[in-house]
Amino acid sequence: MSNIKRYNIFILLSTLARNIVEVFSSVLLYKMGYSLKEILLFYSLVYLTGAITSTIVIYLTKILKPKYILIVSSIIFSGSFYYMSIMDKTFTNLIIFSIIYGLGAYTYHTIRHYYAIKSINNHERKEIGSILIYTNIAIVLSSVIGTYVETKLSKLILAIIVIIISVLAVIPIFKYEDRTNNNKIKIDKIEKNKLLFFICEQAKVINLSLQPL
């Protein structure tokens, strides 16, 4: 099996698991009794944790292969959702969940793009667009599965499903032929217009997440 096929399977399954969490977190927190202000604080802490994590993770690739970072990320992320499924409604638990969630989410989002671009053979790069197809399929499936399980079953069952899918997602990565050069890492300054676009885009994501409330 080629790298791109392994990576697409990883993207399909990992996006399916993660999107269940990303789509339903605000709804589940609201159902637990958290206010809109507390949910906005949750997102603020997630992005703050993400900003720090994204920078550190790139330098971690000098020490660890990206696939191992992705595997650890999957463990942290699925663990964060399990924690939310069993936690009591307290301010401290919300802070802890926000930090764990941010660590797992931004370790994943940072490395998966870096990993695809740096690791895939030149002759396979023309197929990278297929990643978007698998991502969109997973987004649709996650909405359907998440809605059904959350309404018919429980948060704990939903968390267990996320953990199982996350474990299955990392299996193809074990056999991924890693061609990254860990000694060459370049951090470029983000242009102001791109930074503004990113901020507006994330504000849109938060707004969409809060719409069901």
Segment roles from a protein language model:
Residues 1-48, 194-213:
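Helix-loop boundary and gating motifs at the non-cytosolic
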Residues 12, 91-108, 202:
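Hydrophobic core of transmembrane alpha-helices in multi-pass small-molecule transporters
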Residues 26, 138-150:
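Small-residue (Gly/Pro/Ala) motifs that create kinks and tight helix-helix packing interfaces
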Residues 47-55, 139-140:
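Residue-level signature of mid-helix packing/kink "hotspots" within the transmembrane helices
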Residues 53-66, 150:
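Helix-to-loop junctions at the C-terminal end of transmembrane segments
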Residues 68-83, 163:
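Structural signature of the two symmetry-related core transmembrane helices
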Residues 106-120:
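Intracellular juxtamembrane helix-capping segments at the cytosolic ends
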Residues 157-174:
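Symmetry-related core transmembrane helices of the 12-TM Major Facilitator Superfamily/SLC fold
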